[in-house]
Amino acid sequence: MDSTNVRSGMKSRKKKPKTTVIDDDDDCMTCSACQSKLVKISDITKVSLDYINTMRGNTLACAACGSSLKLLNDFAS
């Protein structure tokens, strides 16, 4: 018997997979004026959309402070 293939009584262990916990509260976007948390796209089915105030075009109004929120590419035009 070859001694290189036998592990003299040691059991082989499986490595546990590394897990990382992602805190969803930290990556939520906030309003630049009042720092209130905005709805994430993944939460859109869980939230009532009655409070969203749409202005003209792609501009939204923050429900907490009323400031206008628009996409960054709208500032270039």
From Swiss-Prot:
From the Swiss-Prot or TrEMBL record, state where the protein is found.
Virion; Host cytoplasm; Host nucleus
Reading the lineage from the top rank, the first entry is Viruses
Asked if the keyword Ion transport belongs to this entry, the reply reads no
Q: Which of UniProt's keywords are assigned here?
A: Host cytoplasm, Host nucleus, Phosphoprotein, Virion
> What Pfam families does its record include?
DUF678
* A GO cellular-component term linked to this record: virion component
Q: Name one GO biological process term.
A: virion assembly
What does this gene product do?
Answer: Plays a role in the maturation of immature virions to infectious particles. May also participate in viral transcription.
Subunit architecture: Interacts with capping enzyme RAP94/OPG109, the two large RNA polymerase subunits RPO147/OPG105 and RPO132/OPG151, the two early transcription factor subunits OPG185 and OPG133, one of the capping enzyme subunits OPG113, the nucleoside triphosphate phosphohydrolase OPG123, two core proteins OPG129 and OPG138, and a virion protein OPG064.
Q: Which family does it belong to?
A: Belongs to the orthopoxvirus OPG146 family.
What name does the UniProt record give this protein?
A: Protein OPG146
The top of its lineage is: Viruses, Varidnaviria, Bamfordvirae, Nucleocytoviricota, Pokkesviricetes
Question: Which gene name does the record give?
Answer: OPG146
